[in-house]
Amino acid sequence: MIQSLRKILAVAVLAVPFAANATIFQFTASLNGVNENPGSANQGFGSASLKYFDQGTASLADDRFAFVLSAISLGGVATAYHIHGAASFAENAPVRIALDAAPFVTLTNAGGTLVVIGNNVVAPVLIAATPVTGVNAGHPAMSFLQMLQSGLAYVNVHTTAQPGGAIRGQLIQVAAIVPEPEAYGMMLVGLALMGVVVRRRKQT
């Protein structure tokens, strides 16, 4: 069942309408307790994938992103999960995007397993300059895409036992893609699958 869900999510995460001149930037994160600052004793681990759709327009407000987070062996229910920034591996930073609230959908959060998806999410235009704790004194204001491309965004999952953070992973860029025309058909398939997943969740 988990494998089937992952296959559905792999396609559904692409279900974001984009312009012909759009560029897709892909970021991934590996989450574990060692990455927490300070470290966490939580034995869980997970992965996250974020696809940022740069629409190629003058306004960053037109940009969208899709997101998938999955984690297992958390030792209990996740109490909160967010994207934080701007911060390097050795730093902590404020919450920038709440993954446990709309428009994100939590498909599973039980028995130490967490699965979250977000589709066609409006990308934040500006990440305000905020002092962070850690090695550096702080980072200047920047766009969400700049924060991602600088490796200064991280995913953090919290539990009752580790309210400050159970597992964490830095989002790292792995690809930049200009979609070919045939990719638009894949977008339609992704949209259909996303609808199926959400409907099944509502029925359970």
Name each model feature, range by range.
Residues 1-9:
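Bacterial N-terminal signal peptides that target proteins for export
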Residues 2, 21-81, 85-177:
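Metal-centered catalytic cores of metalloenzymes
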Residues 17-19:
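N-terminal signal peptide c-region/cleavage motif recognized by signal peptidases
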Residues 179-199:
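A short, hydrophobic C-terminal helix/tail in secreted or cell-surface proteins
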Residues 201-204:
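Short, charged juxtamembrane terminal tails flanking transmembrane helices
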